[in-house]
């Protein structure tokens, strides 16, 4: 399981009701179901990946989670997970409002576009950066939002959302190993992970 997913799993309490958005092949859900006895549901856009999840015995809906989340009542889940997907969302503020409505807490992970390797590429080549975390050319990337850890924290302050936990990590896109970054996070971390809740 990817390193960021390992961190996310460690933050989830046993027996929690979990919704995993963009759950991919279901690695996180399967782990949580097996090791933490969660009541887990996933939503995955890809028919192929959703079918794989179902083959693994997971409860997964195939569809656009931006629409699907609006069908759930307030507080339906203890935790909603949005892993490495926020940068592909056209209306992140609207989505987070919906997620904080249906989930008591929301865990978000995203690639840090301010990592030093991306900065150096822009500085020395003058071109859009391509890194292990951002492996696309500018013309074929699914990423439509450029987020840094600093940007996201500022957004949360303006938006009035409380950060319960946060971690900056250094890992490659599909790596099972990584390190926790404790200083100069916006410069040195490849990913940010945050647990959020509404301020009541």
Indicate where each model-derived feature is located.
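Conserved alpha-helix/loop element of class I SAM-dependent methyltransferases that forms part
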Residues: 1-15
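Class I SAM-dependent methyltransferase "Motif I" SAM/SAH-binding loop
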Residues: 22-24
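Glycine-rich SAM-binding Motif I of class I
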Residues: 26-30
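Class I SAM-dependent methyltransferase SAM/SAH-binding core
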Residues: 31-68
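Short conserved loop adjoining the S-adenosyl-L-methionine
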Residues: 68-74
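A short SAM/SAH-binding and catalytic strip from SAM-dependent methyltransferases
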Residues: 79-90
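S-adenosyl-L-methionine-dependent methyltransferase catalytic module, highlighting the catalytic core
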Residues: 93-101, 105-200
